Amino acid sequence: MLRHTLRATALFILAIAAVWVAPSYGISKEFDQQYPLAPGGSFELQNVNGTVAVQGWDRDVVEVHAVKIAKHRESDLERVSIEVDAKPTAVSVATHYPPDEGVEVSVEYTIHVPHNARIEHIGTVNGSLRIASVDNVEELHAVNGNIEVFDGGGPLHAHTTNGNVQMEVAHMRDKDGVTAETTNGSVILALPSDTQADLETRCMNGSFSSELPVRMESTLRPREMHGKLGRGGAPIHLRTINGGIRVVILRSTV
């Protein structure tokens, strides 16, 4: 687990470096707050325009660091608000835009949560999601952007329309499952070599491959496959329209 965590942290640092390269035209304003969260507490975040990066850590605290970036007018920064509802067992963050159009502001989030927090939902419309070293991740949703999970646990449901889905699931209980869906993009799922799961894949315009042995059970429709990893167990659903699907072995690194 430590090796996976170190790798996830390194990848997260690289991701954050990419997040903080703001456009040269950007007029920005920062937001920094911390909120206590009880062990096993929940966290959710809804964004509109901008990347969200979440990293697990050893503190029972949620740290929210955000940068609002306006394309044209500094006054637009005040028209986009970051609202937080913080309770001892649940923290919720949301980006709110004014009802009228014409406000070109993005919000880039960097979040730290306890490793054992429950990620209830994280979503954005235009931007990517990156999650690392969180044991319980539930719902991830993007429209135009990639979804990446490193050293994560389920039950995990990730959906994007225009983007790739890449997930490293280091631990998955029998009652958990994984669902990864995209319309225009590829799906890559990394699992431990001893994973026991029921696997269902569907890729309309692309190929499927697996480094783990798959015992084929049926192909109910063209481009759809049902099989088992090991003895079978937790349900895994992988779907894409325009792209390929790969199941690979999760490899430890130092």
Residue ranges and their predicted role:
Residues 1-254:
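Intrinsically disordered, low-complexity terminal regions
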